[in-house]
Amino acid sequence: MYDFVIIGGGIIGMSTAMQLIDVYPDARIALLEKESGPACHQTGHNSGVIHAGVYYTPGSLKAQFCLAGNRATKAFCDQNGIRYDNCGKMLVATSELEMERMRALWERTAANGIEREWLNAEELREREPNITGLGGIFVPSSGIVSYREVTAAMAKIFQARGGEIIYNAEVSGLSEHKNGVVIRTRQGGEYEASTLISCSGLMADRLVKMLGLEPGFIICPFRGEYFRLAPEHNQIVNHLIYPIPDPAMPFLGVHLTRMIDGSVTVGPNAVLAFKREGYRKRDFSFSDTLEILGSSGIRRVLQNHLRSGLGEMKNSLCKSGYLRLVQKYCPRLSLSDLQPWPAGVRAQAVSPDGKLIDDFLFVTTPRTIHTCNAPSPAATSAIPIGAHIVSKVQTLLASQSNPGRTLRAARSVDALHAAFNQ
């Protein structure tokens, strides 16, 4: 019997595993991942941005964890020889309406404690000669990294400390009892743990349902489609270039991202995926689609954002529409500059009343902890999220009448926080 089993080999699961074994070095800990390696889904299909925390509600978990995670991610990369580029982010306003929205973002960045610089049109042009706008906000702490590399390094540390990673282990059933949890896999394996931690991303709600519980949310998969610019445009921007988002819309808009390999990507958009892991336009699952359309919460989301949703679908099918979005601030790009690039799928939790759950969300039972909503900036925030989960583990252990083996904490969660806040 394991002391802890973690489900999910993305960056949240690996960060949690790495920090849990740091706090409890004598614990028997296993991580189950349904794929043949780590970071195969959201972690390995995002833009790689180290976010600063510009957009998030002051005081929210997203705001707190993103600010701490920005520092922690860079510190982890420095300690483990992982390359990153602290290139900074430029938020660009292209209309008077966007200038008003930019002023609101300026106030929010101040509330979140983020260093930033206000630029007029001339100053913007000096920094970014190929970008057109009325003004901008420069955020120097934003950067770029390969989260696949970060996750692989976390896995290596976890294993070096005695943790066990079991790949090709897709969880198909869970049974919670007073002394622990039984985990069954589609491959025929069966594992038992005193405490279970689920970091299951796109499958988060289904893991809660396996316990016979009503999760109170449903995961809605949104595909984010990207293009890569032709190589001759690898130097077209000096920073990450973001539009000013519409506060009525749930996503940030199409942006230019300088990748860690030197290439530049355009995207992502946000299109409803008709399969939980539907990375291609043609991917379709009848059961997943039935589940999506059968959810009153998702139907309300689609109704509330019908016009923008149809626009996203149109631009997904017609590259010229996608191009127009980026030409608003980078007019020199043409259709021939947009080359295919792999898409990602966001796991967005939706409430029964049709709200996109805005903050990170965790659900606990006497023997389990579930990470239920961890969209962007979860990759940036992975280290503080992992520490937060370890803190929840300690609370859970203290409340259990029969916690199993007595485990000695080698360090406190406060020490984890202190380490990545230095």
From Swiss-Prot:
Its main location: membrane. GO terms for cellular component: cytoplasm; plasma membrane. The lineage of its organism: Bacteria, Pseudomonadati, Pseudomonadota, Gammaproteobacteria, Enterobacterales. Its cofactor is FAD. Pfam families: DAO. The keyword Cell membrane applies. GO terms for biological process: L-lysine catabolic process. It is found in: Cell inner membrane. Keywords: Cell inner membrane, Cell membrane, Electron transport, FAD, Flavoprotein, Membrane, Oxidoreductase, Transport. Belongs to the L2HGDH family. Its EC number is 1.1.5.13. Pathway: Amino-acid degradation. Transmembrane segments: none annotated. Catalyzes the dehydrogenation of L-2-hydroxyglutarate (L2HG) to alpha-ketoglutarate and couples to the respiratory chain by feeding electrons from the reaction into the membrane quinone pool. Functions in a L-lysine degradation pathway that proceeds via cadaverine, glutarate and L-2-hydroxyglutarate. Also displays some oxidase activity in vitro on L-2-hydroxyglutarate with O2 as the electron acceptor, but this activity is most likely not physiological. The gene is ygaF. This is L-2-hydroxyglutarate dehydrogenase. One of its GO terms (molecular function) is flavin adenine dinucleotide binding.
